[in-house]
Amino acid sequence: MSAHEDLVGRIQAHLRGRGELTEGRVLDGDGYFLDGRLVVAVMGSDLCIEIGKDQWDDTLASEGVTPFLFAELPVPGWVMIDGGSLSSDESLSHWIETSLARR
C-alpha cells in the first residue's frame, strides 16, 4: 500500500460517521468533504488544510508545515503538512480537527 493510500484510509476512518463524507478532485489532489465542505486534501503523501489567516503564521512555525502554493505563490490561510509528520493517528487527528474547527 502506498503512503497516499494509507493516508486516505486513515482520513476516511477518522471522518466516517461525522456527516455526509464525499470525495472529489481538488487541484492536484483528492479532497475529502463533510456535508459538502472541504475538510482536507491529500496531495501525494502530504495533507493540505485550511487553518485561517489568523492562525497562519503560528501554524507555519510547526514542524513539517509549509505554505500551500498555488501558481508558485503562497495562499494565506492554507498549509501543507508533510506526510512524514502524519505517521501517528494522533498527529493526523490534530490536523483534521484543526481543519474542522474552521467550518
Which ranges hold each PLM region?
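Charge-dense, helix-prone N-terminal extensions
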Residues: 1-103
